[in-house]
Every structure is written in structure tokens, then in C-alpha cells.
């Protein structure tokens, strides 16, 4: 039997044509074969088989199956699961085990999802290539010599390689969407506050959102519907009503759809192949009845400058808790309290994390706060107003997910600024807090994936996923059906 999505698998599970345990064992066998790709940091082999057997028994005994009954999922290793390792791909947390479940984990578990393991990532979610992991880089399933994107590179690669059906990631400035584009899968960042952050290890608290990676928009809609909603444990979670996302996805039509195309997203710095693929797909949609509307979003390049001021400032504050005193790595060479703090952080954090802590401390320091941090917050408000105005005239804003295709491992590590520019098209949606996603639309001249980036207005996730469903090319040439 062939199952390319949970939308296809679920009815077969409920009909008894295939069991949860059979499905889980297939995925676990694949994970074992792909061990050299460094995609998973932890695999819950025994727990997943036991969980699958329990769900099969529940169905046989007439129990009511949950909305995600038997869905094999992977979890990014910065999301807490009670009793499971929680490393954030950092030496600082190596060996640490979480003592509670994140809200999203509890909600998914209650709807009968099955967790296969925890995926690799950039350390503390800081990076765009998955090369910053203390446990080594993840290989892109399309070309092992290339990066999968980051920071949720392990989650994106797991979905692309068929090592899970759906994965959770986190997105601060593009960390779900950019690797989704590099790995030919759908990657959704919801509206800020749509999903509880309780149990997500903080990088930049006013930006961080848990996101979904999947092969289909409908699978993402289903998982989003389970996770979304207010949470008393997270004061920033929204009480905005949770829609029936699956119905909204089905109700979107291409005919009459107004697609805003910013000229700033198609400048001379864009890879020609990426531009060609994205524009060709937009033209195909125009021929199907959509309207392409030229829009302008001036000073778009200022978004990434403001973003790196704000997120490094927040990271500097959030990561102050890792001091070697309460949990995590403690230097063996410390001789007093002060040296314990300094040496534990020096040895426990990787180069990129230390770089961002130093930048954040600088922009928050006396004499520079107004010049950098306050100014960046003002720029953030300007972008919120510009995007709100643009989306009052169009249904969706479309452009490339990344300015270039997946690049070689090690190709950009010597130039942090060039690496930061990998997020130039994804950062604006994070600055404004609007929902955005990457959807596969084709391949470049080297047969590498190209993603299209879509942004909708606040809390329009159903509409966004419905538009993506029309834009998406057929299932990835790589995806191994079950």
C-alpha cells in the first residue's frame, strides 16, 4: 500500500487495512537505515512500538480514535517531553532530560499521535543551515553534500526522507520555512500566539513560534487544529477562536485570488533559477484565474537588520539562565563561583550562540539601547503597518523562500553575514507576527528544491494553507511512500 500523507493513511488505519504498529515499524526501519544522515538525535523505538500497539488495541476494543490516530511524528529537540532528552543540540544541555510536557506535546498525545524521536537542529535554534549543532550537521536528503537549512533542519529532512509523516519545528525568523524550502516540504509558521510556547526552549520570546512540517497542506492544517488555542501556561497565547482549518483549506479557490508580488523580492541578488521557478509557478496560477498584483514593500532589507538587533537582545536575556549552577553543563575546571559561570558558558555554548549573546548584550548596554534596540522596535512597528496595509489589498503576498538553493556544507560558515541573509525573505513575517509558510513549487537546474514563500493576514492560517495547496507541485520526487 502507498501512503504519501496522513490524509491518505488515516482511513486505512481506521478500516483496519494496516495497523499503527506496522506503520511505526516501517518508519523505525527507515530511521535506522538513515542513521548516517544525523537527522535524529534521539529515537523512541520501544516507546513508539508500545504506543502503536496500545492504539491498535484501543481501536479493536471500540475506543474512539483521536484526530491524529496513529500519526507518526518527529519533534525538534527544543520542545519538552517529560522524561525525554532535551538538548537544543548544545553541549550546554547534553544529558539533560525534561521534567514536563510542552502544551503541544500533551495536545498531540491526547489526540493519539505517535512520537518517533527528537530531531537535530542548530544550537538553541540559532542558524540557517543546521551546521551549528554540537552533534554535527544534518545532510540534505536531496544531496548529502548540502545543508537542509535551519534551524529546524532535522525536522525538515526527516519529513523529506520519509522518516516521519509530520514533524514539529520552531520558527523565530524562518527556521521552519527556510529548511522546508530546502527540503521540498510544506513548512508553516502560524500567527504569533496561535500556538502555546509553553515547553519550547526560548530563543527570542517575542518571535518564537512552534511550526509544522509536512508533505501536504491538509496534514499541516489537521495538526495545527489540534495544537492551536489559548493556554493558561503561556500569557502570549491568543484566545482568538480556532478555525476548522481543514474545511477552510478545502474552500479556497484560485479563481479571483489576488496574489501580491513585491518587486523588492525579485532583485539582482536573487538566484536566477529560484526566480525563474517561482515566477513560472505564479504565471501558471494567473492562467488558472488568479490575479497577480504588483506591490511594493519599501526598505525590505531593513527588516533583517532590525530582526538581528531584536533577537540577539532577547537571546542574551533568555540564555542568561544557563550558568552551570542549576542544570546543564558545568565546567570541571572552575575554581570559584565566578569562574564556574564564565567557564561553563564559554565551554558549553558554541561559537554562533556566543556571537549572538555578545551582540545582544552590546545592543542592550548603556548608551546603545536607544540607538539600536529602541530604533529596531520602531522599525518593527513600521513593517507591521506596511504589511497590514498591503494585505488589505491582496489575499496573499508571494515570493521566494530563500534567495538561493541549498548550499554546500561549510560553504557559508566563514561569513556569518552571508548566512544571516539566507533568511532575508522569511524574516519580515516574523517581524510582523503574521502567518507564513513555504510550499514546494519546483526544482532548479541541479534538480534541487525551490520553495515559494506565502504570507497572509493575522489568523488566516486556513486560507494560507488552502492557497498553498493550489500552489504546491505534486508530491516530492524524493518522498518514499509507505
Swiss-Prot record:
The keyword Nucleotide-binding applies. It comes from the Bacteria. Its EC number is 6.3.5.7. GO terms for molecular function: ATP binding; glutaminyl-tRNA synthase (glutamine-hydrolyzing) activity. The active site is at residues 76, 151, 175. It catalyses: L-glutamyl-tRNA(Gln) + L-glutamine + ATP + H2O = L-glutaminyl-tRNA(Gln) + L-glutamate + ADP + phosphate + H(+). One of its GO terms (cellular component) is glutamyl-tRNA(Gln) amidotransferase complex. Transmembrane segments: none annotated. GO terms for biological process: translation. SUPFAM superfamilies: Amidase signature (AS) enzymes. Keywords: ATP-binding, Ligase, Nucleotide-binding, Protein biosynthesis. Heterotrimer of A, B and C subunits. Belongs to the amidase family. GatA subfamily. Allows the formation of correctly charged Gln-tRNA(Gln) through the transamidation of misacylated Glu-tRNA(Gln) in organisms which lack glutaminyl-tRNA synthetase. The reaction takes place in the presence of glutamine and ATP through an activated gamma-phospho-Glu-tRNA(Gln). This is Glutamyl-tRNA(Gln) amidotransferase subunit A.
